[in-house]
Design a protein with these regions (language model features):
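Active-site core of glycosidic bond-cleaving carbohydrate-active enzymes
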Residues: 122, 371-669
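Extracellular/oxidizing-compartment recognition motifs
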Residues: 1-366, 375, 391-396, 411-415, ...
């Protein structure tokens, strides 16, 4: 699928010798596979930081120098002590990304030092493809067509990084950093690495490397807007939720301890809420060496406030966040509104999109850090509207295409070593392909990914009953909406992960909508096909539409008409004339999860109800973006309010529907 981005490598994969002879552990499996047993992972091989160094000589007159580099799980690259970049984007071993970087400006004539910090986490989660014993790195440096380095690197395991436990859904480790164990200056040319050993080559390494099709992350230096001296330290306010690593300097005595608590909210004027609503406990320890120290945390978090406490007399200064995100230039976005509330809503949605746009479109940058297929619908659309960039969207479509190695019907999170499947999300893939084409006009990608979309189509065709509707889709979770308390009393049994018996509305609206999108894609590609959509649309109306009420019902045996049963039908234009869907939405408002608001609002546009869509965006009920602002949001929430979900993320880009919807409304004027 991506063969044109593969390369033949001259150098080999090197590793920490602890991993040299280990066979990869299996992590890919169907979520409900009863035969899969999670393999035992050695505890002593988790949370491993390894440092690699290599000399690089640059001759006079060298014009351009390129570096190809990858690492598993993740690397940070320094040249002559200067930070260069980090990566790669998370990916499966059979299509593992490498980065290609122009490093010319970081080099000097003569001897240089390449320094790479490689992290292997060892956990099974949505953030990394880890927990599989694949560890190490590979690198080549080229100048004017000539290879400048071999694969002989020196290595040392970084000893200063410890942990007391994991955060959220085993998404990351906390960090206990002991400066007394640090190889101070290891990134610099003058550092004495004579005691370091040569890193072994990992024979029979099974990474299949392909060029990462997107840019590397951008880093911004953000300083606190407010610094408050408290009794035993400092309270820092950065003004908004930021995704990144906190950094600072300290001068103290050997053994002094600084406790670092981060959070999105305050408990009081002098205390941060470091146990986040989204079940992340942010509390790290920094143990000082004698004299000056510089904090270098490796893993990123999402936070606004930092509380620093110490019982020592250490001097603390240079507080900042290395704020990370995918390149984000919204200067060409021309949308403007005189409505002050719209301006505020736009800002919190934009901030959420920027924070969640990392090397993938993350659901949130703290709890899961995963690229969810359903969320992609909203986030990628909003990101395009803001920046005009479609590269990250295209990469995401291929990321999910790669997941069909596990299941032809596609995984709900990709990449990542945690397996999750959601039927609703898989059925949105065809719409996402069509949306990508409308944004990019990239017909070739549409052609490449059509077989993937057809695989999903055929996967769900097997669940057809006598009239063409699908039922008993028990191999994947039927979501409808999330959290479950915002399903508007949807009248169907939706346990997780196996749905109840019968034929219900939303899964069929998505199925018929998928058929509609597939026919549009085939038309664009001028591929002949046997039409199915028109007939299935009529069947959907016969199965779920109530002539008496002018509304769709939740299942073939229900008389209840939820918002969801009508919103998805409106989104795909499955309704007959003279329906009462707009009146239902006007009455109910946004009695749904934030994610489903995208489908509600676009459904209203299809119905010709622009004014009602605008009213819903600006409404001031408990189910509104205004409510998020009222509760202090700087980034859009996962739910309409902090207490409307048991583990609400306060930075969730699936809440950014107003951005594409408002721009669509402006274009229709």
């Amino acid at each position: 699928m991506e063969e044109n981005r593969k390369k033949i490598w001259k150098n080999h994969w090197i590793c920490n010798p602890k991993f040299e002879d280990l066979k990869p552990l299996p992590t890919l499996h169907k979520q409900q596979d009863p035969t899969f047993r999670k393999p035992e992972h050695r505890k002593d091989l988790k949370n491993i930081h390894t440092l690699f160094r290599k000399k690089l000589k640059i001759e006079a007159g060298t014009k351009r120098v390129r570096m190809d580099i990858s690492a598993d799980d993740y690397y940070k690259l320094y040249i002559n002590g200067q930070y260069v970049t980090q990566g790669p984007a998370n990916s499966y071993a059979f299509c593992y990304y490498y980065n290609q970087i122009d490093i010319t400006d970081y080099l000097q004539e003569g001897e240089n030092i390449l320094a790479v910090h490689v992290y292997y986490q060892g956990l099974v989660n949505r953030a990394y493809n880890s927990g599989d014993y694949r560890q190490g790195m590979i690198a080549e440096v080229w100048a004017d067509g000539v290879s400048l380095i071999d694969d002989v690197w020196k290595y040392k395991e970084a000893e200063e990084y410890g942990a007391s436990g994991t955060i959220a859904y085993e998404t990351q480790f906390d960090e206990i950093i002991d400066e007394r164990k640090k190889a101070v200056g290891w990134k610099m040319p003058e550092y004495d690495d004579s005691g370091w050993k040569t890193a072994p080559i990992r024979e029979n390494d099974d990474h299949e490397l392909i060029l990462q099709p997107t840019k590397n992350l951008e880093m911004e230096h953000r300083v606190p807007l407010h610094i408050k001296k408290i009794e035993d330290g400092y309270l820092l306010d950065f003004g908004e939720d930021l995704t990144g690593t906190f950094a600072m300097k300290a001068n103290g005595k050997s053994g002094d301890i600084i406790t670092i608590r981060c959070g999105e909210e305050l408990l009081s004027e002098v205390q941060v809420r470091n146990e986040l609503r989204c079940n992340c406990l942010y509390e790290d320890k920094w143990i000082l060496k004698e004299g000056e120290n510089e904090l270098e945390e490796f893993e990123y978090k999402c936070f606004r406030y930092v509380q620093l406490t110490t019982e020592s007399s250490a001097e603390l200064w240079d507080f900042h966040v290395d704020y990370r995100h995918y390149p984000f230039d919204d200067s060409s976005c021309t949308y403007h509104s005189e409505d002050a509330l719209i301006g505020q809503i736009w800002e919190i949605c934009k901030n959420a999109v920027r924070n969640c746009s990392q090397e993938a479109f993350l659901d949130c940058p703290h709890r899961e850090k995963g690229q969810y297929l359903g969320d992609l619908t909203v986030t990628a659309h909003a990101f395009y509207c803001l920046t005009g960039d479609t590269d990250l969207f295209r990469k995401a479509l291929f990321d999910f295409a790669h997941s069909t190695v596990v299941c032809e019907g596609m995984m709900a999170v990709a990449p990542g070593s945690f397996m999750q499947e959601i039927a609703d999300f898989s059925l949105l893939y065809a719409y996402q392909l069509l949306l990508y084409y409308r944004c990019s006009k990239d017909l070739e990608t549409l052609r490449k990914l059509l077989p993937v979309a057809e695989g999903i189509e055929w996967y769900f065709d097997r669940f057809q009953r006598f009239d063409g509707m699908i039922e008993n889709v028990k191999t994947k979770w039927n979501l409808v909406d999330w959290p479950e308390n915002l399903r508007d009393d949807y009248d169907f049994d939706l346990p997780q992960p196996v749905v109840g018996d019968g034929c219900h509305n939303v899964i069929n609206a998505l199925y018929v909508g998928m058929k509609k999108c597939m026919e549009e894609i085939r038309d664009l590609l001028q591929i002949e096909y046997q039409p199915q959509y028109a007939a299935l649309r009529k069947t959907f109306i016969r199965a779920f539409y109530c002539e008496e009420t002018g509304l769709f019902v939740d299942s073939v045996v229900s008389s209840h008409s939820s918002l969801h049963a009508n919103a998805f039908a409106a989104f795909y234009g499955l309704y007959p004339e003279n329906n009462q869907i707009a009146d239902l939405i006007r009455k109910k408002g946004l009695c749904c999860g934030v994610f489903v608001s995208y489908f509600v609002l676009y459904g209203l546009l299809n119905l010709g109800e622009k004014e009602l869509a605008y009213e819903l965006i600006t409404n001031k009920s408990e189910h509104s973006w205004y409510n998020m602002i009222r509760e202090g949001a700087t980034t859009a929430f996962e739910a309409w309010g902090k207490d409307q979900k048991w583990n609400t993320s306060l930075c969730h880009a699936w809440a950014s529907a107003p951005i594409p919807v408002l721009m669509e409304m402006e274009q229709q004027n």
